[in-house]
Amino acid sequence: MSILVTRPSPAGEELVSRLRTLGQVAWHFPLIEFSPGQQLPQLADQLAALGESDLLFALSQHAVAFAQSQLHQQDRKWPRLPDYFAIGRTTALALHTVSGQKILYPQDREISEVLLQLPELQNIAGKRALILRGNGGRELIGDTLTARGAEVTFCECYQRCAIHYDGAEEAMRWQAREVTMVVVTSGEMLQQLWSLIPQWYREHWLLHCRLLVVSERLAKLARELGWQDIKVADNADNDALLRALQ
């Protein structure tokens, strides 16, 4: 089995390195890269507006990294008053490392639905909520917090940018390297991969590969696109992906 990892850098490269250490044949094929978000200049003032028991959310490690870089440039600190939340363990660790604050996150699965089930997010009417995220993505968290009575604002900390490839050339390369397992960690990247690979290679190679995804929502999308052999990892971090690939 040869494994194609589409997760962006640096996590994608780390996963490939760990797979190779375990004797697996693995390749990195990142589909997106990241650049600073347009709303970063407003971040420090948005953070300063948060009071005691208000809510601060980080939806990815990338949001934390770009936010920290911006605050460092402005010689500003993370606030101590709000309650901190993260989408999952890895993002929580990154946020704790830069802020020093206690971070609440879902212990089960790193998805919006599970985050929103936390007891601390049930009675939030009248609280301010600031969500650190990238461009695009799902609106479920913001919409749900608003429905529960919170005053929600966003800071686009980074932008996802598609990396451009010659689809036929890449399909030939990965088919020649006998790739039979593909790792995809977002719906956006799954759609991008499907669109990138020309129809002939899609039907004769890509859709015959086993697909490893990180949620049932992604698995459903994959089935709609034509995949049949789909495995869902028990979480979205590299440890979970590694377990699923053993």
From Swiss-Prot:
Q: Which residues form a coiled coil?
A: none
Which keywords annotate this record? Answer: Lyase, Porphyrin biosynthesis
CDD domains from the UniProt entry: HemD
- Is Lyase set as a keyword in this record? yes
Gene3D superfamilies membership:
3.40.50.10090
One biological-process term from Gene Ontology? protoporphyrinogen IX biosynthetic process
What are the recorded GO MF terms, alphabetically?
uroporphyrinogen-III synthase activity
What SUPFAM superfamilies does the entry give? HemD-like (SSF69618)
Give the top-rank taxon of the lineage listed in the UniProt record for this protein: Bacteria
In short, the EC number is: 4.2.1.75
Family listed: Belongs to the uroporphyrinogen-III synthase family.
Q: How does it assemble?
A: Monomer.
UniProt-listed PANTHER family: UROPORPHYRINOGEN-III SYNTHASE, CHLOROPLASTIC
Protein name from the UniProt record: Uroporphyrinogen-III synthase
Organism taxonomic ancestry: Bacteria, Pseudomonadati, Pseudomonadota, Gammaproteobacteria, Enterobacterales
Q: Which gene encodes it?
A: hemD
